[in-house]
Amino acid sequence: MASAAEGDMEAELTRGLLWGFQDLSLNKLATSLGASEQALRLIISIFLGYPFALFYRRYLFYKDSYLIHLFHTFTGLSIAYYNFGTQLYHSLLCIVLQFLILRLMGRTITAVLTTFCVQMGYLLAGYYNTATGTYDIKWTMPHCVLTLKLIGLAMDYYDGGKDQKSLTSEQQIYAIWGVPSLLEISGFSYFYGAFLVGPQFSMNHYMKLVRGELTDVPGKIPNSTIPALRRLALGLVYLVGYTLLSPHITEDYLLSDDYENGSFWFRCMYMLIWGKFVLYKYVTCWLVTEGVCILTGLGFNGLDEYGTAKWDACANMKVWLFETTPRFTGTIASFNINTNAWVARYFFKRLKFLGNKVLSQGLSLLFLALWHGLHSGYLVCFQMEFLIVIVERQAASLIRDSPVLSRLASITVLQPLYYLAQQTIHWLFMGYSMTAFCLFTWDKWMKVYKSIYFLGHVFFLSLLFILPYVRKVMVPRKEKLKKME
């Protein structure tokens, strides 16, 4: 009887322990936080960068380069496996293909074009084969980061074969003069501080890290702990805020009957608030990963004029500008900085032969839309960005050149009202653009746009055609002649 009772107790205890472990599973934890298991894995993986960075600082700084490349490759592959399982083969395959392209085709335009077609083609095929009606965290997420890295690598390698005098000062900084090995390309690609969500950085910058050059104290480990912790702390603030508010400010509500039946002004205000809030998940990830990059030294960006170390080489966010700017161009300049810099360096500036800056900008935004995915919402979002930036520049130029508008804009007592009006317009139409980006399928974003009567398109297309006529009336002829001269 006693043994039977003990057996029952053991069975009960085993069931209790199993239930406890199940209760502590990632899925249950994610559910309790209002997130998906994949999202929780992503956050855990990003934070894992800190112990990896500490290990690197303690044991590998100034060690043999092959050890550092192996460490970065192993940790990056581990993160890939933890998040995507055996689907990590996609990144491995593209890295090996890129190595072969560079070795077999050399420093040729053929290698650059082949790289662009192969890497972008693979990414777009991945988008096509994994597409669903909702946003999912899958292997294509880090792969889009990798795609830009490998295309940039091919272009820098190509520049390294040119006469140095024919390169711009920027191209000379990034040009690769040596021949990267497979291990070097792997370490560069899988670096744990940027593999999942960025930021973008060049092979040359990565190799400076490996050689121990990215430090404010030559010959010693960088004094980057405090700057890294500051970015981590700021990232945690955004993470807590997003976690607490995300159950109450959702994109699903935009599709609900409750939203559609609300007043027009309510629909606009909800879109404004949601448009600001939805970006915080990206801000969180980039601030946390920036802290990892700073901790390793990758974030070192030289010294300022006072001899103080700058740690913004991997900054993907200018938080103060992001939170305070009343302009769309200000948000663009403060958000996803390194990706925007990559597009400017490797795409926009390389289209100079077209002789048309607006066309180059439009093609760059089209590339960004395709890079994000094949859904129509991405195209609509970046089309709106293109339109808004053009109109904003027209409006700024009109106010600057018109004596009447310039005097009105300079009235101090009215500055708070101007700022409030600008911020309202700014974030309302940021939310309008982000609606297509986040809902991304035709039926979803079209439903929301119909509910607010395509306000963003009507407002900015109207201004695009009206502002030139307003300029003729408001800007004196002498100002126009002076500008032409």
Curated annotation (Swiss-Prot):
A Gene Ontology cellular component where this protein is annotated is:
endoplasmic reticulum membrane
Active site at N336, H372
Segments traversing the membrane: 35-55, 82-102, 108-128, 139-158, 176-196, 232-252, 283-303, 362-382, 420-440, 448-468
Location(s) in or outside the cell: Endoplasmic reticulum membrane
Q: Which residues carry this modification: N-acetylalanine?
A: A2
Give the location of motif Di-lysine motif in residue numbers: 482-485
How would you classify this enzyme at the top EC level? transferase
What chemistry does it catalyse, as a reaction equation? Answer: a 1-acyl-sn-glycero-3-phosphocholine + an acyl-CoA = a 1,2-diacyl-sn-glycero-3-phosphocholine + CoA; a 1-acyl-sn-glycero-3-phosphoethanolamine + an acyl-CoA = a 1,2-diacyl-sn-glycero-3-phosphoethanolamine + CoA; a 1-acyl-sn-glycero-3-phospho-L-serine + an acyl-CoA = a 1,2-diacyl-sn-glycero-3-phospho-L-serine + CoA; (9Z,12Z)-octadecadienoyl-CoA + a 1-acyl-sn-glycero-3-phosphocholine = 1-acyl-2-(9Z,12Z)-octadecadienoyl-sn-glycero-3-phosphocholine + CoA
- Domain comment (free text): The di-lysine motif confers endoplasmic reticulum localization.
The UniProt family comment states: Belongs to the membrane-bound acyltransferase family.
In its UniProt entry, what is this protein called?
Answer: Lysophospholipid acyltransferase 5
**Gene encoding it?**
LPCAT3
